[in-house]
């Protein structure tokens, strides 16, 4: 474990493989293992095994149908975090209405920031966080990366204005995608956060989200 820096605990909220998790554990004080659910499959026994192994676990729904979001929230929110990663605004809105814990990178594969003022206000009201993920940027060409950062800045402006919970994560699927605290803080600054806001997105807000599972 990394150990608190000047009394601050840093949390990596979205790690998606064993090898990435093991590396992230060295760099962060707490790590959430994010289990990508196969399409349409919510296996209670498999989830129990993962929770027993990793402790803090997020069920991550990739481009889900609303019915799967509803099932995940109803059956599993008591013991797991629920994340939704989708560029479909209908799914994003439904997920926020259902009270998932976080929406991850809704701007991915879109030509806008993936949320608007209405959704940002709703996220504040429902306590739904916005996850700013580094991983998609790693595989983009310079033009695509510049556009993605532009949309992330617009999303951050809404998050900041409406006081939406937030976190920054590598969302790593392999150990070479894992990034440390300083690099994730740098991402926050690149999208318009002040340093203290970027640190809070790796500490204060993640710890608040994890508090629900205690």
UniProtKB/Swiss-Prot annotation:
SUPFAM superfamilies listed in its UniProt record: PHP domain-like
Example of a GO cellular component annotation carried by this entry: ribonuclease P complex
Subcellular location: Cytoplasm
GO BP of this protein: tRNA 5'-leader removal
Keyword Chaperone listed: no
Predominant location: cytoplasm
Pfam families in the cross-refs: RNase_P_p30
Keywords noted in UniProt: Cytoplasm, Endonuclease, Hydrolase, Nuclease, tRNA processing
EC id: 3.1.26.5
Catalysed conversion reaction: Endonucleolytic cleavage of RNA, removing 5'-extranucleotides from tRNA precursor
InterPro entries linked to this entry: Pol/histidinol_Pase-like, RNase_P_comp-3_arc, RNase_P_p30
Molecular function terms, GO-annotated: ribonuclease P activity
Function: Part of ribonuclease P, a protein complex that generates mature tRNA molecules by cleaving their 5'-ends. The RNA is catalytic, but its KM for pre-tRNA is 170-fold decreased in the presence of the 4 known protein subunits (Rnp1-4). The protein subunits also decrease the amount of Mg(2+) needed for activity.
Subunit details: Consists of a catalytic RNA component and at least 4-5 protein subunits. Forms a subcomplex with Rnp2 which stimulates the catalytic RNA.
Family the UniProt entry places it in: Belongs to the eukaryotic/archaeal RNase P protein component 3 family.
Record's protein name: Ribonuclease P protein component 3
Species: Pyrococcus furiosus (strain ATCC 43587 / DSM 3638 / JCM 8422 / Vc1)
Gene name in the database record: rnp3
